Every structure is written in C-alpha cells, then in structure tokens.
C-alpha cells in the first residue's frame, strides 16, 4: 500500500517538530512543551510509522532503540586519527606549553579555547547529509569499535542535524559520560538486583557503550557532549575552534558548558582555578581542563606528534587516586546491626581533601580484593563520595601480613555475630540492647519521614545517649526541659522547642510509626501496605510469617524480619512504653472500605513540585493505592515531574513511560482518572 501524501507530510512535520523540541530541551536547556505533549507527538508518530513502515527513516525519533542485538562489535578506522592529549600537572608545565606555542608561532599573544576535561569515553559520530550513520569509540586512535547501535539510544545524541549549510559529511567528536546522579542511582539498582556495581562513572559509560544489545544501553543514564570535529567534506567550517563549537550547537549538538576563549597564560590559570572550584558542584565528573590554540591556521603551523597535537594541552586536577597504607581495619556497627569494616589510612591528600578512612563494604569485598592491614593501596575519592580502596599493590605487601577476619562478637556490645545464609552482611544479634544500634535507631525514629521530631539532630542524639538520658526511643518522651537545657549548645528556648516537637510527634499515623520502629527491610511503602492489610499494630504483631507472606510485595525474607522483630520481648516493651507515653494514631479504616483507584499502578517523582512537597505527593498517591518507587524501571507506570527534573526523565522517555507534569498530576489527583 502506497502511503498517502497527507501521511507523508504529517510524519515529516512530526519528525521536525520533535527534533526541534529535543534541541530546545537538550542543547539550549529551554523546554518548549510539557512532557505530556511531547509524549503525545511521539505516540502519534509511532502510530503513523506502524501503519506505513516504508516511511520509517534512520533519523526518526522513534528509532533510537530500533536496532537488533549484534553478535560482536566491528572495527572502524578513523580517517583522521583521534589523538591523545599531552598532560600537565602543575603550573610550570602549563607555562612551558605556553612558551613553546608562542616561540613556534613567533607571536606575542595567544588565544586559547578553554574547555572542561570530561571524564568519559571519547567517541566519533559520522553524519551524512545531516543524518547520523555511524558511531565509533576512539580505540587506539587509529581504529575504534562500531557502537552505532548503542550511540543512537543516547537521548542527547542528535539523529539528524538541524539548520543550514551542513557539510555533506561531518565527523563530530565528543565524550559520552554518565552523570553523577544517574551513576549513583544506577549503582543502587545494580546492588538491589544483586549485581556488581561499577567503580566509577567512566567505567559505567564505557561498559554501557560496549553492549551488544542496544536495549541494555538504552536503560543506562548516558549523555554526550561534543568537543570538536574530524573529517569534513562538502562544507566550510569557521576558522576558529571556539566558533566551530558554536556552529555545532547551532546544528543541534550539545557542547560543554563553561567553554570559553581565554588570553595568554594568566587567562589559562584563572580558568583552571575557576573550574577547579566548580568541580564537585558539576552534575558530571571532570578531571581537568583542556586548552587548545583557538585559530586553526595556528594549529596547522604547530602540527602534531605521533601521539598528541602540539596545539593542545590537558591540565589535570589534583589526583583523586593516591597511594597510601592501611594502618588498621576497624569494624563499625550500623542501625540494623550491620557490621561495616573501615580501613584506617595513613592520611593522604586526594582530590582536594585529606583522607584518613575508606569503606571496605563487607567481608566478601575484603576477600575479593585481598585487603590486609599494612598493605599499600590506591585510594579513590570523587566529589562527596566516601573514599574507597581501589586495589592493593601486591609488590609492597609485608611478608608477615595476614588475611582479615571479621570478629565473632560485636565490637560494641559483645553479642554474637550472625550472617544469613547466602548473605554478604554480618550483623550484631544484640538488637536495641546494642548501644551502636540504639543510637542509630533513635536517629531513624526521629527522622522527617518517621516521627518527624524537628530539632533532634545527630549530634544531640550523640550527647543524649552518651550521658545515659536515652536508652531507647521511648525515653524521648520522658525528657525534660531541664535535662535538655544543660546540654552543650542547648539553651532554654531550644529545649522548649524540642520538647514541643517531641509532644507534637505523639500524634502520628500507623504507617509512619511502623516505619519509625526501624524493622529491617520495612521502608515507607511496606509500612503503608502492612497498615492497610492488618489495620492495627496489635493485629500485625501477632501474625505468623506464613500470613505475612500472603501480603502483596512481602516475601519470605521481609516476613521473617517482621515476625522476628515482634517476637523480641525488648521491642514489645519499647512499643508499650511509647504507647504509655501517649504516642497514638487514628484508627485505620477497614481495608474493604478503602477506595484505592490507583491500586496496582507504580509512580516515580522527580524535580520540585510547587503545590506540594514530594513527600506530600507520595502520601497522596499511596493513600489512593499507588506504589511510589525511588527509581524509574520498566515496571514504572508514570513519572511525575516538577521543576528541574533529573536523569529519571531521560530514562522514562527511553522506556516510553507516561510522563505527567504538575498541572496534569493535580487534575488527576482530583478525579483519579489516570490515563
């Protein structure tokens, strides 16, 4: 069947419209339409292409994840080599580079194009007549791997260039990376699935691009920034690197923010310091800055060596990996009794701070890396991430070193250490008797999403437990103003405010109270389910594990934790103490009478809502039977977005999940007629 002219025209119009919206959203950071309208256009285009498959083209926005898995990654030869950059690590090396440039050019002043040095994976994108036809890794600079099927899945990669005077053949070079937020969320999901997390965003990006199945890559939070060009045919580009970047942006490609032209050595030094100050505030990792002689004719005069051009330099930031020695391995006890080994290090300056400790996660991780006291190790720190041991330098291992063993008794209370079959985490069996667990349990109990006791911060809890004023959470309701006023940094006014907050917290809800108790594996959503299912604390406390397993989303492990908690006499005593102190909640309605129009639907929230907090939105959805998760997955039904949404929005679009802005969300809450 020949497609009618109106269908052809509408498909072309939709592709142009969607590509324009993508440009506004990803390149100039200025969304033009609500996501609901964007999704409607995508669905319309998909429907038309299903009816007229002969009209599907490579540049269609619907074809990002259209390729089939490949058996292996082919090789692609770079017509113009993708060279490395020479590195500088201190001001003297930067000054030497600047002096060599001026001497070779025989000029008094040099303009440099200055750019952040993104810590990702270098790639080449080939456009023919404005359409993306090929993607390749840098490889060894001469030959890379064919990743066309994967590069197309990245939302920030333009499938078709826009604008005028686009060369018939244009090779664009850039860096694929994984934003910090996306990386952290992705690793949390990996751990939750029992899979190995990535060490850093760069490794995550590289591993994602080398997948054989593009559907896997499409589910990874990847993005791209462009930093230059390679092969160009059938067109003319500007004669300055900075202007080429501007032209790439006009054609619909993303370039790095903070790219600018600086003058002379002083301009380079000022730019370096500015980016160093910004480093940990950026949503992506950078490991330095790059300076390129801006004028192309000057670049040609300077030429290149076999490995790197003479006209560019990477000025690296202070190392975020350094060598140091493990002085000792200490074991910390958390709120749930989990034992976490921590390496005490010879202090070392890493990534702008002095590091003296690093997490070792668990006994299995120590054994996998064969970490021992006295070892010389590489320690890494990136942004605000807790420092960690990367690897051991075996050549420097002491001859009398011994493998580390977890203690058999809790280092805090002396209780027996237990480890579940097949589990990685060792735990103290002391429960709330253990001072370490007690302290963390009180902090959790007072948290904003639990009993919401405003003013009871971590340091105050430390003081109260240290002085013996708090032995368990029930003791909170027996505190007096006189006791509080005598503490460090606590006057009469602060004491009065805290007492008032404690009194206000007595009136709560059953789901909040259950969550506040800190039962293992019982988060906010599970607490909601339990409250609705059993209706009262007494009913829940008396049920068997078998009955608990009949509840939606409650498996055997969670059921065992709940039953074990209520079997513990000490926990029952604490609950009785809380109720005796006046902690109460309204009766939960009979579950049969509760209207839950959103039952079975899963929601994720992102961004800042204007009409309510995300916590309030979550509670309203849960009250209507909806399930609210923290991350987007193929099981998500709706993503609700506020201002400044994060990487969840990109992932939701890739997965075809329905996206609702705040206006739609409020309307749907009123009549609960979700699409």
Curated annotation (Swiss-Prot):
Cellular component GO terms, alphabetical:
cytosol
Q: What is its EC number?
A: 6.5.1.2
A Pfam family of the record is: HHH_5
| BP GO annotations | DNA repair; DNA replication
One annotated GO molecular function: metal ion binding
Kindly list the positions annotated as binding NAD(+): 35-39, 84-85, 115, 138, 175, 292, 316
Matching CDD domains: BRCT_DNA_ligase_like, LIGANc
Sequence ranges assigned to domain BRCT in this UniProt record: 593-675
Which amino acids does the record list as binding Zn(2+)?
410, 413, 428, 434
Record keywords: DNA damage, DNA repair, DNA replication, Ligase, Magnesium, Manganese, Metal-binding, NAD, Zinc
Q: Which cofactor does it need?
A: Mg(2+); Mn(2+)
Record field: catalytic activity = NAD(+) + (deoxyribonucleotide)n-3'-hydroxyl + 5'-phospho-(deoxyribonucleotide)m = (deoxyribonucleotide)n+m + AMP + beta-nicotinamide D-nucleotide
Enzyme class comes to: ligase
Please indicate if the UniProt record lists Ligase as a keyword: yes
Function text: DNA ligase that catalyzes the formation of phosphodiester linkages between 5'-phosphoryl and 3'-hydroxyl groups in double-stranded DNA using NAD as a coenzyme and as the energy source for the reaction. It is essential for DNA replication and repair of damaged DNA.
Q: Which family does it belong to?
A: Belongs to the NAD-dependent DNA ligase family. LigA subfamily.
Protein name listed in UniProt: DNA ligase
Per the UniProt record, the source organism is: Nitrosococcus oceani (strain ATCC 19707 / BCRC 17464 / JCM 30415 / NCIMB 11848 / C-107)
Q: Give the classification, highest ranks.
A: Bacteria, Pseudomonadati, Pseudomonadota, Gammaproteobacteria, Chromatiales
Gene name on record? ligA
């Amino acid at each position: 069947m020949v497609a009618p002219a109106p269908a052809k025209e509408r498909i072309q119009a939709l592709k142009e419209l969607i590509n324009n919206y993508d440009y506004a959203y990803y390149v100039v950071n200025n969304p033009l339409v609500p996501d609901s309208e964007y999704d409607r256009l995508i669905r319309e285009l998909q429907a038309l292409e299903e009816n007229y498959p002969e009209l599907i083209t490579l540049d269609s926005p619907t074809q990002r994840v259209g390729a089939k898995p490949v058996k292996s990654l082919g090789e692609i030869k770079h017509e113009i080599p993708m060279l490395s950059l020479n590195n500088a690590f201190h001001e003297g090396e930067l000054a030497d580079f600047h002096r060599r440039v001026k001497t070779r050019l025989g000029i008094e002043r040099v303009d440099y194009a200055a750019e952040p040095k993104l810590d990702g994976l270098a790639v080449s994108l080939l456009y023919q007549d404005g359409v993306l036809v090929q993607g390749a890794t840098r490889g060894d600079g001469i030959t890379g791997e064919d990743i066309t099927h994967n590069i197309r899945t990245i939302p920030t990669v333009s499938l078709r260039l826009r604008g005028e005077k686009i060369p018939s053949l244009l090779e664009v070079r850039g860096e694929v990376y994984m934003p910090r937020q996306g990386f952290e969320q992705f690793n949390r999901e990996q751990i939750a699935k029992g899979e190995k997390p990535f060490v850093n965003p760069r490794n995550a990006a590289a591993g994602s691009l080398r997948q054989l199945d593009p559907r896997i890559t499409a589910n990874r939070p990847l993005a791209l920034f462009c930093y230059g060009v390679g092969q160009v045919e059938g067109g003319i580009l500007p004669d300055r690197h900075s202007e080429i970047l501007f032209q790439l942006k006009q054609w619909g490609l993303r370039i790095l923010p903070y790219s600018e032209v600086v003058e002379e050595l002083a301009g380079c030094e000022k730019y370096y310091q500015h980016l160093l100050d910004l480093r940990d505030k950026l949503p992506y990792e950078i490991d330095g800055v790059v300076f390129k002689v801006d004028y192309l004719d000057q670049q040609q005069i300077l030429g290149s060596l076999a490995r790197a051009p003479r006209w560019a330099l990477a000025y690296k930031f202070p190392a975020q990996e350094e060598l140091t020695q493990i002085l000792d391995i200490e074991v910390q006890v958390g709120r749930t009794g989990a034992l976490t080994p921590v390496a005490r290090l010879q202090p070392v300056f890493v990534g702008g701070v002095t590091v003296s400790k690093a997490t070792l996660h668990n006994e299995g991780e120590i054994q996998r890396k064969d970490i021992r006291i006295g070892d010389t190790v590489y320690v890494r720190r990136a942004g605000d991430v807790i420092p960690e041991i990367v690897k051991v330098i075996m050549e420097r291992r002491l001859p009398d070193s011994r493998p580390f063993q977890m203690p058999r008794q809790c280092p805090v209370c002396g209780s027996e250490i237990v480890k579940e079959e097949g589990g990685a985490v060792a735990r103290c069996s002391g429960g709330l008797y253990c001072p370490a667990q007690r302290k963390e349990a009180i902090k959790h109990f007072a948290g904003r999403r639990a009993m919401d006791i405003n003013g009871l911060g971590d340091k105050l809890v430390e003081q109260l437990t240290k002085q013996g004023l708090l032995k368990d959470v029930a003791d909170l309701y027996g505190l007096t103003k006189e006791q509080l006023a005598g503490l460090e940094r606590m006057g009469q006014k602060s004491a009065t405010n805290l007492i008032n907050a404690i009194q206000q917290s007595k009136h709560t809800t059953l789901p909040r109270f259950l969550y506040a108790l800190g039962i293992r594996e019982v988060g906010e959503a599970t607490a909601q389910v339990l409250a609705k299912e059993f209706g009262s604390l007494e009913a829940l406390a008396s049920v068997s594990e078998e009955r608990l397993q009949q509840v939606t989303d409650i498996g055997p492990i969670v059921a065992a934790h709940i039953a074990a908690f209520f079997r513990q006499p000490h926990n029952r005593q604490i609950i009785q103490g809380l109720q005796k102190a006046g902690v109460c909640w309204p009766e939960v309605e009979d579950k049969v009478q509760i209207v839950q129009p959103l039952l079975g639907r899963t929601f994720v929230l992102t961004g800042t809502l204007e009409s309510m907090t995300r916590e309030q939105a979550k509670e309203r959805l849960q009250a209507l039977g909806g399930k609210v998760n923290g991350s987007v997955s193929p099981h998500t039904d709706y993503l609700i977005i506020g201002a400044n949404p994060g990487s969840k929005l990109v992932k939701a679009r890739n997965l075809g999940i329905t996206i609702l802005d705040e206006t739609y969300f409020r309307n749907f809450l009123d009549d609960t007629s979700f699409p």
